[in-house]
Amino acid sequence: LMVCYGGDGTLLEGVHRLCGAPIPVMGINAGHLGFLTSAPSAGLNLIFEEVAAGRLTTEPRSMIEATGDYAEQPDTELGLNEFTVQRHGAGMISVETYVDEQMVATYHGDGVIVSTPTGSTAYSLSAGGPVVAPTCACLVISPLAPHNLTMRPVVIPDSATITLRIDARRSDAFVTLDSRVYAIGQEAAFTIKRAEQKIFLAVPHNISFYDTLRNKMMWGIDIRS
């Protein structure tokens, strides 16, 4: 068991260090929101009693594998939440997007997010993407500030392979995997697909995904009451 004490960024760094090894990860929230670090820092003794008694729930979470034109990195990297392409300068970038070699759209704007179900409550949510239960077998493609009123997020099966072709000749661009930032050239291409490896999140047995949605994001809460 790996225990990450901090916020979601701490847990994502721990996941990166595991490199897909089948070791459960438990996040104890000492940060601000802590959606993935669902165990509260108050009452640590009770939490570790549950660990010792084997009362944790282990949830498998899918990861993504992104292969492409990193400037100074290996060709392939893994992520738990999302892969993003983002503009670095003032101008728009264009991202041709394909699913299983079929053209989906060319997104003109600030970039594109490819999210896992786990990452659907992170950056993708801020870009208007849907909340996806972590057990769903899908990926979400969300445009970032698209210069087109008809562009909306799209949900695809996680058996598909996504190809992104980036044209950033008018503005510098970079890509991210979770909290890690990578430089790229003006014209780069990446393929994103579900990774063979999974991450196993260990959570207290009395905390569900929907509990976390309500408690951390006020989901479904009537603010008038």
Regions found by a protein language model. Name each.
Residues 7-10, 31-33, 118-120:
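Short glycine-rich anion-binding loops that position phosphate/pyrophosphate groups of nucleotides
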Residues 13, 18-28, 35:
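Gly/Ser-rich helix-loop-strand patches that form or flank binding pockets
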Residues 106-110, 114-150:
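Gly/Ser/Thr-rich active-site loops/lids in small-molecule metabolic enzymes
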Residues 71, 77, 85-86, 90, ...:
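ATP/nucleoside-binding phosphotransfer catalytic cores, i.e., glycine-rich phosphate-binding loops
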Residues 4-8, 15-17:
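N-terminal glycine-rich "phosphate-gripper" loop used for MgATP/nucleotide binding
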Residues 33-110:
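Catalytic core of DAGKc-family lipid kinases
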Residues 13-15, 36-37, 124-126, 151, ...:
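Short glycine-/acidic-enriched loop or helix-start segments at secondary-structure transitions
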